Regions:
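Short conserved loop adjoining the S-adenosyl-L-methionine
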Residues: 31-36, 52
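Short alpha-helix
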Residues: 112-141
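Conserved Class I S-adenosyl-L-methionine
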Residues: 139-190
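Class I SAM-dependent methyltransferase SAM/SAH-binding core
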Residues: 1-31
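A short glycine-rich, Lys/Arg-flanked "PGG" loop and its adjoining helix->strand segment in the class I
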Residues: 55-69
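A conserved beta-strand element that flanks and buttresses the S-adenosyl-L-methionine
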Residues: 43
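Active-site recognition of the HExxH zinc-binding catalytic motif
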Residues: 47-50
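Conserved class I S-adenosyl-L-methionine
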Residues: 67-100
Length: 190
């Protein structure tokens, strides 16, 4: 089964071959109307920061997943905080709201959402409170999306080059955080 956001409706014709034989559901990640452990895996990419209670979203994903949860979101790093201060990144995602301020953003209400950025410690603490009897295996990985920047400006090219070197040595400062919660390797704590 695949759960999707209603915005996918626009893309279904374009991706029809990928979706043949799949069950699609319009769902609210804050209140998933599925049984516990109903899905093998639950995956989300750049979604949780669009809701008002992202911790509840992770709680629900954890509840309905039998084997694991994959979350790809923004990383709360020193570099990202600095980027927000100097306006290289958004603290509130104004770019996600349409020009008429009718859709996009927080809960698709036309209000710019706060870009919630995560840390390893925050995820670990959340899982300890959600499921205190199990010690979860969590794999964290870091990446950046600077490779998507296409520019002929020599200064931008130099900045990107040195950013790649910096991120090689300081991997956890990158802007993307992947979190895989492997429920198959959970150990009993109590």
């Amino acid at each position: 089964k695949i759960t999707y956001h209603k915005e996918l409706n626009r893309n279904i014709e374009n991706n029809y071959n990928l979706l043949v034989g799949k069950n699609l559901f319009d769902a609210d990640v804050r209140n998933l109307r599925f049984n516990d452990s109903e899905f093998d895996y639950v995956i989300t990419n750049a979604t949780l920061h669009h809701i008002d209670v992202p911790h509840v979203g992770i709680s629900e994903m954890y509840r309905v997943a039998k084997k694991g949860v994959l979350i790809i979101e923004s990383n709360d790093s020193l570099i990202m905080r600095l980027a927000c201060k100097i306006k290289l990144s958004e603290e509130f995602e104004e770019s996600s709201v349409d020009r008429h301020k009718k859709t996009g953003g927080l809960l698709d209400l036309g209000i710019p959402n706060y870009v919630y950025r995560w840390t390893e410690r925050e995820i670990s603490k959340l899982l300890k409170s959600l499921d205190p009897s199990n010690k979860n295996t969590i794999i964290f990985d870091y990446e950046n999306d600077l490779t998507n920047i296409k520019s002929k400006n020599p200064l931008i090219k130099i900045i990107i080059f040195f950013s790649k070197i910096f991120f090689f040595f300081f991997k956890k400062q990158q802007n993307c955080l992947s979190i895989f919660i492997d429920k198959t390797k959970s150990l009993k704590r109590f």
